[in-house]
Each structure stands twice: as C-alpha cells, then as structure tokens.
Amino acid sequence: AIRWLRAHSSKYGINKKKIAVWGASAGGHLVGMLGTTNGVKDFEGTVGKFLEYSSKVQAIINYYGPSAFLQMDDHPSKINHRSPSSPESKLLGKPIDQVPDLSKQASPFHHVKVNLPPFIHFHGTKDPLVPYHQSLILHEAMLKQKNESCLITVRGGSHSMPPDFTDQFVIPFLDFHFYSLGSQIHSQEIKQKR
C-alpha cells in the first residue's frame, strides 16, 4: 500500500517524503510493524507491481495496538490471548505460545532499534481487549533506543479514543514533524471523559 501511494503520488498530491500511518487495535499493530521494521529488507516482501518504491513511513499514530504478543496475558484482559481462537493466534495460524519465534517476529516490540520514525501512542488503562501495558512497553523500548515516542495515557479509558484527539493531538503531532509547526506533543495522562 505504501509503495502504491508513492507510485501514484503525483496523481493524488501526496508528498512521498511525508507519509504517516494511523491504525487502531489490529490496525495499531500493523502500523507498529510498519514503523519498527522501517527499512528492514526481510520485511519488504516481493508482492505487487511497485517494488522499486520504498515502503518506509515517516510517522506512526498507534491507537491501542498489540506490540508484544507473548506478554499480552501477563496483564488483565477479557481475552485469553494464548487461546487458539485469539486474534493473535489466528493471525499466526497457531496458539502464540506454540510458535514463540513467530510470535516475536510478528510483534513490533521485538523490532525496536535506533533511527525509527516518531511514534505517538494512545491507550486506555482499562482497555479490556489489548492491555495498556502493550503501548507502555513499546513506548519505553522506543525511548531506550533514543527514538521519539509519545504516550497519551487515558486513565480509565477503554478500547476506543475520543474523536477530539485528532485535533488535540494527532494533527499537532503531524504538523510538528512534517511542517515544523507548533510544539512537540509530550507524553501525558488524561482522565477518561464521562
């Protein structure tokens, strides 16, 4: 998809040097993988017509995506993530604990290294499906490698984010990184609005 966008950038008015990806839940996992495997040849693949174009992205917006499959059951959740019927096990084709190497390969947390694009993570502390810990450990791993990462913690928040977060955080995050406008968004905790 990223290569396709670059190949058609002039037709759609896309700046090839400023591509951000945004995903929630399973989509958050996918954008986390895109960001942490940015430029890793083994993850480039050979599918599609536009292999001459880069699949690198320049910013990641992660809404409560899984980041370390094998640690998901270490924290409260309504899902038994090690079950054969869990979303993570279905993705891998087997229960995650039966394929630990594949589980790690499919987890953004295990691909964090230096020189990654900036991330902003959003996660509720009461998320019943993807434990808050998933964004926290990815954020901390990013910082440990001197990458830019911001975590917006929603105290009492569930598996969703308020629509006003787009204007409050996402647009300013992109403005700062892509256009040097405004100020940098910093990690913070917000109470869930009732």
Regions found by a protein language model. Give the residues of each.
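Histidine-bearing beta->alpha loop at or near hydrolase active sites
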Residues: 154-161
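Catalytic active-site module of serine/aspartate enzymes centered on a nucleophile-bearing elbow/loop
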Residues: 165-194
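Primarily recognizes the serine-hydrolase "nucleophile elbow" in alpha/beta-hydrolase
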Residues: 3-76
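Short beta-strand/loop motif that positions the catalytic acidic residue
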Residues: 115, 120-123, 127
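Loop/turn elements at helix/coil->beta-strand transitions in domains of secreted/extracellular proteins
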Residues: 16-18, 55-59, 116-118, 145-150
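Mobile cap/lid helix-loop segments that gate and shape the active-site cleft of serine hydrolases
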Residues: 36-42, 48, 71-111, 117
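Conserved alpha/beta-hydrolase "acid-adjacent" motif
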Residues: 128-137, 161-162
